[in-house]
């Protein structure tokens, strides 16, 4: 038995080594709230305007999304449906997979479940990490997904981003450092950093971060549209169990009072 256990440990070492070497960059955490309908509505707007030219959400229906996000059906059809689809149709696109493979080398993936597959932190950082790279076919690369095979569709909002040197705040043990006397942030020059060229995008950095966060919030909802319903039902179940426990305890005392 001991030999088998040792053999399993040794067999797992190459996998652990691979995971350590290919873990990717450290991801900035993002707080996603799928109960925020305003954020999801803005995310839907960004998704339909910037993503649905190539990516579908074919496991969702326009009607279900409209109802969940509190959008009237006529508004959904006029602002988020550009293909002549009906309110009960799936959120598909007109591009055929065979054509997409010919044009791009591979068909763009469906994004209905991408937040479940990749995670919200990964999506948030990926969408903010495109930078100019003339050596790539679309002129851009990505810090989170090196040699990415898609263009930066949000460049008009974010602006042109390049890799260079800039002053960044000192971080020790995961905490940002400040001057103890003045309270100003302590900085140092770091290279291989992403920098947005001034006045090349329609949004400032804070606005763009919020726009991406809202898009990721919508994708998180799309990946699990019944999450809030499950949480609500779970609350009722726990309340029922707590209520039932009181009567179960009283019944137990009644059964055992003669024994004790």
Predicted regions and their residues:
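Sec-dependent signal peptide recognition
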Residues: 2-9
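N-terminal signal peptide c-region/cleavage motif recognized by signal peptidases
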Residues: 14-17
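Electrostatic cytochrome c docking/interface patches
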Residues: 20-45, 56-67, 223-231
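Stable alpha-helical elements in mature extracytoplasmic
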Residues: 36-39, 46-47, 107, 119-123, ...
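The canonical Cys-X-X-Cys-His
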Residues: 47-58, 215
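Electron-transfer interface patches adjacent to heme c in soluble/periplasmic c-type cytochromes
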Residues: 70-143, 148-182, 189, 193-208
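Short, aromatic-rich amphipathic segments at membrane interfaces
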Residues: 197-234
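Juxtamembrane interface at the cytosolic side of transmembrane helices
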Residues: 230-260
């Amino acid at each position: 038995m001991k030999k088998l256990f040792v053999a399993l440990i040794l067999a797992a070492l190459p996998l652990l080594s691979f995971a350590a070497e290919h873990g990717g960059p450290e991801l900035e955490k993002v707080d996603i709230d799928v109960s925020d309908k305003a954020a999801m509505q803005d995310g839907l707007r960004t998704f339909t305007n910037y993503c649905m030219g190539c990516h579908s959400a074919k496991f969702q229906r326009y009607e279900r999304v409209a109802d969940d996000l509190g959008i009237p059906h006529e508004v959904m059809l006029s602002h988020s449906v550009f293909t002549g689809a009906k309110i009960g149709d799936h959120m598909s696109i007109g591009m055929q997979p065979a054509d997409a493979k010919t044009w791009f080398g591979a068909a763009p993936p469906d994004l209905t479940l991408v937040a479940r597959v990749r995670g919200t932190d990964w999506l948030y950082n990926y969408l903010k990490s495109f930078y100019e790279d003339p050596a790539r076919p679309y002129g851009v690369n990505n810090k989170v997904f090196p040699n990415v095979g898609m263009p930066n569709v949000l460049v008009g909002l974010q602006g042109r981003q390049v890799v260079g040197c800039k002053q960044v705040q000192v971080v020790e043990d995961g905490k940002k450092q400040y001057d103890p006397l003045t309270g100003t942030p302590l900085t140092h020059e770091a290279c291989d950093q992403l920098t947005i060229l001034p006045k090349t995008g329609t949004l400032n950095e804070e606005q763009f971060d919020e726009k991406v966060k809202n898009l990721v919030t919508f994708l998180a909802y799309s990946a699990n549209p019944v999450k809030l319903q499950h949480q609500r039902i779970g609350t009722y179940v726990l309340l029922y169990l707590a209520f039932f426990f009181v009567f179960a305890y009283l019944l137990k005392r009644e059964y055992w009072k003669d024994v004790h």
